[in-house]
Amino acid sequence: ETPTPTPQPGEVLVRTVAAGVNRADLLQRRGYYPPPKGITDIIGLEASGVVEAIGAGVTRWRIGDEVVALLAGGGYAEYFVAPEGQLVPPPPGVDLVTAAGLLEVAATVVSNMDVAGLKTGETLLVHGGAGGVGTFATQYAKSLGAHVVATAGSEPKLLHCLTHGAKVALDYHGDWVDGVREATGGRGADVILDIMGAKYLEANVKALAKRGRMVVIGLQGGTKG
């Protein structure tokens, strides 16, 4: 048991309805990926709920508002506090349970695709295409008018990639570099969204188109090749 947090100036207290489950949460449960200094040791990087109280100076929210939050931690508790700027309303027609799992992947994908400058007609290579980030990246890229080539490690996951918008799905146990080249008429991918790090670096470079862009958002394959 821990005390219900008190919102400080500029903060909002939210009664939790649902929380997302991310890889970072699973790692913290196993004793890895510790929270930054000064951040609660209660896990949970995204959650949804109802505003219970507001701190001094808060103008965007009122008690009773439904909100979704991106957090440094604390989303798995019955109540959490967050700066008012880290809260957004749930999308129209989306319930709080579903909305709780949107912000982390959405922020990751949208910000990194903005950095990469993905354009209409280009090809995005997504590693881990059946995961939360991979699925959202596929759908977001399609909304921009881009084509998606995704990698995954099993038949069900490859099917998931295809049914969620990937033009081509490649088994990463095979020669996916050749698969990317074939899918792009020999050009290679214009943008790569990579979660593996050093393990895939050499192959990613081979799979890139001339003047392509690669964004590394994870190091699941380590920092050394």
Which positions does each model-derived feature cover?
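N-terminal Rossmann-like NAD(P) cofactor-binding module of classical short-chain dehydrogenase/reductase
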Residues: 68, 125, 170, 192-193
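Glycine-rich phosphate-binding loop and adjacent beta-alpha segment
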Residues: 152, 161, 196-225
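Short glycine-centered segments of the SAM/dcSAM-binding site in methyltransferase folds
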Residues: 66, 123, 147, 191, ...
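Mid-domain Rossmann-like dinucleotide-binding core that forms the NAD(H)/NADP(H) cofactor-binding site
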Residues: 100-174, 179
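Glycine-rich beta-strand-centered segment in the early N-terminal region that forms part
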Residues: 3-21, 32-74
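Cytochrome P450 core scaffold surrounding the K-helix E-X-X-R motif
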Residues: 24-30
